[in-house]
Amino acid sequence: MILDRFNLSGKVAIVTGNSTGLGEGMAIGLAEAGADIVGVDKDLPQNQERIEAQGRRFLGIQADLSSLKPIEGIIQKAVAAFGRIDILVNNAGIIRRNKALDFSEKDWDDVLNVNLKSLFFLCQAAARQFVSQGTGGKIINIASLLSFQGGILIPSYTASKSGVMGLTRLLACEWAPHNINVNAIAPGYMATQNTQPIRDDPVRSKQLMERIPAGRWGMPEDLQGAAVFLASDASCYMHGYTLAVDGGWLAR
């Protein structure tokens, strides 16, 4: 039965940036589909009760992904707790806003370190574990509309998210022979901490809502279906694709 292919029972998913917003929404969606969750966040993840309320197991790992130091430990702790990993959701990310003429090297490096460098090396560590298990696996990178467009005032964020889409394609090509699916989700304008400055600007917010065919801000729950699909056997023939969940923004 087709619905059985979406079932994640017995799977273990690592979700970075798991405590709030999009990461929390995807973690809960994966748990509802049957996966046990390893939540990774800069602060100790706070949503253990919500995951366990779905009848799933939860391991919280506190890790600062602005450096590569925690990465091997994340995989090791997950495997020690659950015996395996099957899914990686690379959701952790930061943003810095300023005009390109005034943008600092620190704001450039801070964003690229979290959004692209740590993402790549966490993909690498997870893929090595998938290969050693001999079972394949699923990697879901979180891209952005800025993977497709330029935007303004966020040069390092646009660069990082363009890189995420490119890396997703490259890794998919290299790792498909290992039965590893690497795909990405590009959220549209979502009601999260990252978009709070825009939502607080009535003029800018109104302009955005007039362009989005769905006529509203996206919510974390809007990514759950895409995340479950890309984490499940239903997407086994998908490699290197970036799926926009954007209320129709790119179609406009």
Question: Predicted segments — roles?
Answer:
Residues 99-100, 104-112, 208:
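Substrate-binding pocket helix/loop in short-chain dehydrogenase/reductase
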Residues 144:
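Residue(s) in the substrate-gating loop at a strand-loop-helix junction
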Residues 123, 160, 168:
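Active-site helix of classical SDR
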Residues 216-250:
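C-terminal substrate-recognition "lid" of short-chain dehydrogenase/reductases
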